[in-house]
Amino acid sequence: MSNYPYASMRDRYDLSAYFVVGPQDTKGRPVAGVVDEALKGGATFIQLRAKPGDAADITAAARQIAQVIADNGKSESVPFVIDDRVDVAWQCRYLGIKVDGVHIGQTDMQPQAARALLGDDAIIGLSAELVAQVRA
């Protein structure tokens, strides 16, 4: 059962055009505009990576990106995750912003804790550089 009516934990993801973007990557262009171009160019998965960034700024960017994904008619086909910031992903979902989950690193919050906060329907991505990390 979903904690959030808009969330969708998919059985499979198309990672063929996984697009990672944040304000630090766009040379002053609006992140949402860059995401719009990426979607029109065939992006299949969106990750907001805003470093550095405070919760309010990341939430605002996430709201804009989620709207762009919806405006492109891809809310059900293109997952949207936030990098590292489980707190922001939780806040977005609480506010009704369609964020599908997070991508966290080995030194971030434990994936089990992220799952507990975001629910069973959330995507929890985890960076892994070693086979042992995948098996852990």
Residue ranges of model-derived segments:
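Conserved N-terminal beta1-alpha1 strand-loop-helix module at the mouth
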Residues: 1-107, 117-131
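Short, charged, surface-exposed secondary-structure boundary motifs
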Residues: 110-118, 135-136
